[in-house]
Structure formats: structure tokens, C-alpha cells
Amino acid sequence: FFAEFVEEVHKRGMKVILDGVFNHCGSFNKWLDRECIYEDAEGYEKGAYISADSPYRTFFRFNEDMWPYNYHYDGWWGHDTLPKLNYEDSPLLFDYIMHIARKWVSPPYNVDGWRLDVAADLGQSQEYNHYFWKEFRRNVKEANPEAIVLAEHYGDPTSWLQGDQWDT
């Protein structure tokens, strides 16, 4: 359905931009599963909140080894319902998000770009943030050179707008 929707939008002279929230997820996401939605659900791995052996364990930064039901993870601006994603320690998460960056701007979906939520707050350091967005842009532009990378940022965006990270 989505590919047909985008095609119809394009026929009408409009563009489709996806909202990418790559800084954090919800505490209900299967990766963390703080609400235990998937804990006993068939076909789902245990979330990182539930088990230290979760395949998603490295997707988050835990401050204490207190499983099961580990509340000691970093949240975006301290919000425990918005667990911050931990790209620096998780090549698996990084690769997964780069795959997503490419997938949606490629056929059959052909969306026209990404709007990036709280983009400058992504990693634990500005150096890593710049590295991540350079790789994100490279992946998007290799898949669709016409796709736009539009970021939400509060403050001076100059260092992000050098032609190798965000378009605007």
C-alpha cells in the first residue's frame, strides 16, 4: 500500500518525507520492552529491559547491571519513556538504521527524504553525531541522490550544514 501511496502523491506533484526518530525510541518498543508487552509473546526476543541476554542489549546504555527489569538506562533528557539509543556501543544498531535510511528512499517506496527528530542529540558526543549523520547522508544519497535530509536542530546549525550531513 505505501509504495502505491507514494506513487500517487508523486503523480499529483507532491513529495513524501518520513519523520525519522533515531535518537530514542519508546519504552514500549520491543527492543527495550519496559511495559513487558512482548515478554512472553511468541516469536519475540526478550527486550533489553527484561534480560541482559537480549539481542537488543547493546542498543541502550545501562548504568547498572540489575536484571531482570533494569530501570537503569539512559533516557533522552532523563525521560525514562524515551530510552536513548546507544549507537557508539552497537554496530548492529548502527547498521540496522543505515539499512532503514536507504530502504525507504529506494524502490519500491521512493520517498523523497527524511526529517530528523532532535538530530544533534543523537550520540554521546558531537564527534560521533557528525560521524553518524555523515554516514546516514551517504547512505541516503547513494540510494537516492535527490532525497533531502532535513534536520530539527536548536542552536547554530553551521557545522551540520557543510554539504556532508544535513541539507537543511
Please provide the spans of the model-predicted regions:
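Proline-rich intrinsically disordered, low-complexity coils
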Residues: P55, P68, P83, P91, ...
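Short, flexible, mixed-charge acidic loops at enzyme active sites
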Residues: R61-W77
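Transmembrane beta-barrel strand/turn architecture of Gram-negative outer membrane proteins
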Residues: I17-L18
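The substrate-binding groove and active-site-proximal loops of carbohydrate-active enzymes
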Residues: F1, S27, G78-F94, D117-Y128
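Short, solvent-exposed loop/turn segments at the edges of secondary structure
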Residues: G78-D80, Y109-V111, Q165
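Active-site-proximal helices and loops of the catalytic beta/alpha 8
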Residues: V6, H10, N23-H24, N29-F59, ...
